[in-house]
Amino acid sequence: EMCIRDRFASAFLDLNPELMAVIKESVDEIGLGGELRLERKAFSDGVLKGQRFLVDEGASESSNHTPWKVIRERLIQSGIKQEIRENALGIFKCLAEAEALVHGIDVEEVVFHEVGAVDSMVDVLAASVILDAYHEANWFLGSLPLGRGEVQTAHGKLPLPAPAVVELLKGFDFHDDGETGERVTPTGAAILRFLTESRGLSQKPETIKRKLLSSGQGFGSRKLKTKSNLLRVLVFGPEEKSPEEDRIRVLRFEVDD
């Protein structure tokens, strides 16, 4: 059964389909075993169109209790490109440190309960490939949706946003758009925290004139009441094209999921 993965990867695969081959290569290098299949699929919710990123675990490893130190060792021992590996280690480290803080344990004792080895590795590797592909870009982010309610976890019911998300996204701007449920996942929050620490991700409005080059839209699985469940990424280049400035300068994305 194909499972819909995160909107971050989906949006960038809509923007740049060629990234799929690099994501598959990186996932193969990690050696998750079994019959793991990755797929990008066009999707329309009847209002907007974009892409979904799908994963079929097949007979792959599937554990919902994965120690951080096991994931770290697996990444260190892998043959994936160094920059992609460092991105993945950085994202998982952000997540592990947040989990350690909220549960009052040592970071070396962190076990990821809510994400299986395959799920989390694919999401983080996909994000790591994307960050490497756009390593020269400046990153900007709109206000984040807050969400409300509770989520059932291995630790029982927890309030939303989940405690790890709150820890990861301290200092970020949020808004309440009236939608309930989880709006930013811990993995998504870890990607944003890592982008802030490693790429200077900002939520401040851009004041320099830029030329809009392209966009991508990634859809999640949940249906929201009042809006499309998507993340949109906009790519900007310099206002006036010149040979020495012929590259992407700015990536801005909005989370409406």
Regions found by a protein language model. Give the residues of each.
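Alpha-helical support elements that line or immediately flank enzyme active sites
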Residues: 7-19, 126-134
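Mobile "lid/hinge" segments at catalytic clefts and subdomain interfaces of large enzymes
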Residues: 136-255
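Active-site pocket-lining segments that scaffold enzyme catalytic pockets across diverse folds
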Residues: 123
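Long, contiguous binding/interaction regions
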Residues: 109-116, 188, 249
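Divalent metal-coordination and catalytic microenvironments
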Residues: 53, 119, 192
